[in-house]
Amino acid sequence: LEAKEAAKKAIDRFACGLSSSRPQATTIEHVQLEKRLAKWFGFETCLTFTTGYQAMLGTIAALADKDTTLILDSYSHACILDGTFLAAGTPGRAPEVRFFNHNSAKSLERILKSRERKNALVLIEGVYSLDGDRAHLKEFVEICERYEAVIVIDDAHGTGTLGERGTGILEETGLRDRVPVCVSTFSKTFGGIG
């Protein structure tokens, strides 16, 4: 009931829909939401996008460049694949792209050892949408730390379902402080997007 009333007030104040870019419309509300989400998830900061899909595309675009190897699980969600392929198609900024065998720490380590670029982003899902299994997160984090790679986790299917407070696989595994980037979505847990 509280959420419905808040939504009605927001519609009265800002209208409904994304009729312009964020700085021209609801920035105040977005900043407040981001502060609350960052605190809830246990991160220093948070950035909201219209959808979880767009959040992953934006994250990859912001972090990947010509000095980066993007390393993906072979069962990666479409948002990770599309973000990677968009980044790879950017002239002058295109990263190296490699895939590791699904949920295989050995395969990931082999690729990190042989990468050609200075920086590495390892893109995984907390709970894989393709088959429902969980990432071998502890092993992946240890390997990424060993090879100075940044791990980016899509926890769309873990948020709301895993951990004592429902903040996802990072809470459940106790690895929150060792994973710098986590992407999630409102559409699967919170019942609202846009």
Task: Please name every model-derived segment.
Residues 23-27, 78, 105-106, 127-131, ...:
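Short, small-residue-enriched loops and turns at beta-alpha junctions
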Residues 48, 53-59, 79-80, 159-162, ...:
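Short glycine/serine/threonine-rich phosphate/pyrophosphate-binding segments
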Residues 51, 72-89:
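Substrate-binding/gating loop at the entrance of the active-site cleft, primarily
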Residues 95-153:
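Active-site phosphate-binding strand-loop segment of PLP-dependent enzymes
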Residues 171-194:
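Active-site PLP attachment segment
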